[in-house]
Amino acid sequence: MDATYRRLLGAALVAALLLAGCAGAPPPPPLSEPVAPLAPVTRSPREVALERALGEFSGAPYRSGGTTPDGVDCSGLIQALYQRTGVRLPRTVTDQYQAGAPVGVNDLRFGDVVFFNRYCQTRGRGPYLASILSLGDEDEVCHNGIYLGGGRFMHASPRGVFISRLDAEVWRVSYRGARRYFPGGN
């Protein structure tokens, strides 16, 4: 096989893979029964303040030790969000984990904080090694995010502040628990 043929074959393979990735799933079948509208969600004043603060931080860049929308890390995000609701939290993930009331995974509500050991292994080695190294110690917590509902949570990772799903394998296997900080629930 000459070099030109190999390059042409490689380019064709890449193009085929890209086109296959663009193909969408077929549309879902129509529903046989009408769907009832969702009941309106009533939020407490603290939850309204939390929703507003979430908007401020959405898409913020990652900055180790940061606590502002200009740059924030995971525990700084949680501390800053709760500060805007009038609730003072400690600064570190470990201290935040110890401060809240435990919540079962099936009882999660908007505003609860979820904890993981996903980034524990990166200490002293840089955050980008997290994707290739094994998880941290079973009992250690070193990453957290705020639960939004519907299995989603917002967190600050090395890629910035964004929303992930709890049922994604990386988060499911590194999940260590949740805490509630609003007095009397949310």
Please name every model-derived segment.
Residues 2-3, 23-45, 120-186:
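Aromatic- and glycine-rich peptidoglycan recognition patches
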Residues 28-32, 36-75:
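Post-signal-peptide N-terminal segment of Sec-exported extracytoplasmic proteins
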